[in-house]
A protein has these predicted regions:
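Non-ligating segments of multi-cofactor redox enzymes
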Residues: 1-165
Length: 165
């Protein structure tokens, strides 16, 4: 059995700095990664976003921050919704939307139960954060969002499925 990439999010450590979001925008905005992704629009897309939750009120207020992104699902609904093999779950666990094959496949946006797939109107293609697959394939040990997280709220690990249960 092959080890798979997983992103572990420790919500107790997230401080809402948005470094992860900025790293993704820096890597993908107006930049094409052939076979991996078309250029991400400069504005309007947050392939990694941070949801904010508030509980209580003054003087006792609890605020939480939850980074959200593509979960690279084991049984990814986007893979099932895709036509002509436009979305693939790789052996290493990473889900990749092929920017050429996915042209015009807006149904992929609705297929994601987590709202992690975005429609790029300019490119006419569905897009998501692909775990920086192009960097991983070039030998990087972690995606950029993990690399820039100042608190360690994001961790990438490569393990067998049985170790994640």
């Amino acid at each position: 059995m092959v080890d798979k990439w997983n992103l572990v999010v420790d919500v107790e450590e997230c401080i809402n700095c948005y470094n992860c979001t900025l790293a993704v925008q820096d890597e993908y905005a107006e930049v094409s990664h052939v076979g991996y992704s078309a250029p991400m629009p400069k504005h309007g897309h947050r392939w990694i976003d941070i949801l904010r939750g508030e509980r209580g009120g003054f003087p006792i207020l609890d605020v939480s921050f939850v980074p959200t992104m593509c979960n690279h699902c084991d049984n990814a609904p986007c893979v099932a919704a895709a036509e002509n093999g436009a979305v693939k779950k790789r052996d290493d666990g990473i889900v990749v939307i092929d920017p050429d094959k996915a042209k015009g496949q807006k149904q992929l946006v609705d297929a994601c139960p987590y709202g992690a797939i975005w429609w790029n109107e300019d490119e006419q293609v569905s897009q998501h954060w692909n775990f920086d697959a192009h960097l991983i394939d070039d030998g990087w040990q972690e995606p950029r969002c993990v690399n820039v997280c100042p608190t360690g709220a994001l961790k990438s690990i490569k393990v067998k499925d049985s170790e994640m249960t």
